[in-house]
Amino acid sequence: MTYALSLATYATLADVRMELGVNDPIATDDDPVAIKALRDATARIDLELPGKTFFPRVQTRYFHSFADTDGLNLRLHEPLAELTSVTNGDGTALAGSDYTLIPRSGAPYTAVRLQANGATAWQAATDGDPVDALSVAGVWHSTRPFSGMWYTTGETITLASPTTASFTPSNVDGEDAFRRTPRLSEGMLLKATTNGTTEYMEIARIESGVVYLQRGARGTTAVAHTSATLSAWAVDAVIAKACVRLASYYYKRAGHFASVTFNPNTNMGERLPKDLPEDVVSTLDKFKGANSPTFRILDV
């Protein structure tokens, strides 16, 4: 799989401007600094929470036919939001009647269970190699219950070809589904579906009401769209807030490398660098060690 540099961030430029109290839409000179701070903050959150991502990704993942199975069950390494296909080690694409996704109540799915009364069993590859013999294609990501979700932006999008890299929304500064303004901002992950093909796009920048995009993001393929409904991804609210706080901290701390702390043992002040704000540390600590947390993806 080819990976591209991601421009999506766990919070948006508009979020940071609000946190910093920048209300003048004309005051944009420092926006590049704020955007860099957002990308740095997103990267730091990913570093602090290895193995987790709070954006959906379309991907085929591979599993060991022995080590990752327990009888009828294939254990998934990360919660699965939407299933596209399951392929056995012998190359057979399993039919929906061959398996059940666990839990039965719906996503997030943590396992694929073969039917007990069926003739199918998990198999190694045809050469006998069990490593990466099984594959599961779908949409994956980590978040908490009912927190990460797609919502409609109130816009439609027309892109004449897979290489068209910009569009002009009807009202870039209008309200979104949560009555927030602007409805589109740098750092957002967008989604559009045409003729059954879904594409993710990332907002690279917005200039003079024109939205510039990175196409075919997060494992999807760029396609042409005509008046397709445009949705945006709402990052887990707690992670989004941590990103806003950390990005604002990086923004304010630019060029400053130490803080003064009083040491009661020496009665002297000590200049010590403060790595992360305490509220951000507290938030990230709550996500550490949480293996495959329960979540559900919604469209609203």
What are these regions (language model features)?
Residues 27-49, 268-275:
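Amphipathic alpha-helical segments that form the core helices of the histone-fold
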Residues 31, 63, 77-132, 197-207:
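Extracellular/luminal ectodomains and secreted, surface-exposed scaffolds of diverse proteins
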Residues 76, 83-84, 143-215, 220:
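Autoprocessing Asn-cyclization modules and mimics
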Residues 2, 104-152, 216-238, 242:
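Surface-exposed interaction regions enriched in Ser/Thr/Asp/Glu
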Residues 2-13, 141-151, 233-300:
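Short loop/turn elements at secondary-structure junctions
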Residues 65-76, 263-267:
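Surface-exposed ligand/attachment interfaces on beta-rich extracellular proteins
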Residues 48-70, 158:
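Solvent-exposed, flexible loop/coil segments flanking beta-strands in beta-rich domains
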